A protein has these predicted regions:
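Enzyme catalytic cores with a strong preference for nitrogen-chemistry domains
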Residues: 1-232
Length: 232
């Protein structure tokens, strides 16, 4: 049994990404139930009548961008799977999580995502369990977070008792430009951890009704608010 994310488009399953690092400490005991991706020898699985690729090294390519997936605790690893995925072309990382709450943990989580998106020079979309999913053992705040290269773009309301959806735009062209000029990122490709990525091509159609919501500071080098005291 694996803990996995499934990518589906128009009724077709494109791939299955199993969780790599299973926490088995404190309130977590996932190794009792699940098998790590590191112990899965198969690279495909039959699911809903379809035989589809399976692995923690899947990259999903569209005409516009390439994305990869990791699951919850994977982000907490010393070398997260997303590091390898980013070095092999993933520009956006999605993390499906059941991250419970603890005192001070939210700030630590935000710091982790910020740092990982900065190290990978990527977008990072984090979605955790929330409304209606807390139990007598753990509490979920429903964290929804979108980061780009270390910067927060959008966040959901915590502990909301209704369903939520956050939307923002990740500047993929900016990510590509940053990677081109970052010689350390280029050099790291030669020492890329993890398995070679399996690339899955998929169609992507832009919505004609899409309205951009992201705004940009017209004076990025002029500090505002509390930054004024620290920088000037």
């Amino acid at each position: 049994v694996i803990n996995a994310a499934v990518v589906i488009q128009k009724g077709k399953i494109l791939g299955v990404v199993p969780k790599t690092y299973l926490p088995n400490y404190k309130e977590f005991y996932e190794q009792r139930w699940f098998t790590s991706a590191l112990q899965v020898s198969e690279n495909s699985v039959r699911l809903c009548g379809q035989i589809v690729p399976m692995g923690n090294n899947l990259l999903f390519e569209t005409a516009e961008t390439t994305f990869g997936i990791e699951i919850c605790e994977d982000l907490w690893a010393t070398v997260p799977p997303s590091s390898s995925l980013a070095l092999q072309g993933a520009e956006i990382i999605f993390n499906l999580s059941a991250d419970d709450e603890g005192i001070g943990k939210h700030n630590y989580l935000c710091s982790l995502i910020s740092q990982q998106s900065a190290r990978c020079i990527s977008g990072y979309v984090f979605s955790s369990s929330g409304f209606g999913e807390s139990t007598t053992d753990v509490v979920f705040a429903g964290n929804g977070l979108i980061y780009e290269n270390g910067y927060l773009l959008a966040r959901s309301e915590r502990f909301c008792l209704e369903e939520q959806l956050i939307i923002n735009e990740i500047d993929v062209e900016c990510i590509r430009a940053e990677r081109r000029v970052n010689t350390t990122f280029a050099a790291n490709k030669a020492n890329c951890p993890g398995k070679e990525a399996i690339r899955i091509s998929t169609e992507f159609v832009n919505s004609k009704d899409l309205n951009l919501t992201r705004t940009f500071n017209p004076h990025p080098f002029v500090p505002q608010g509390s930054e004024l005291n620290s920088r000037c």
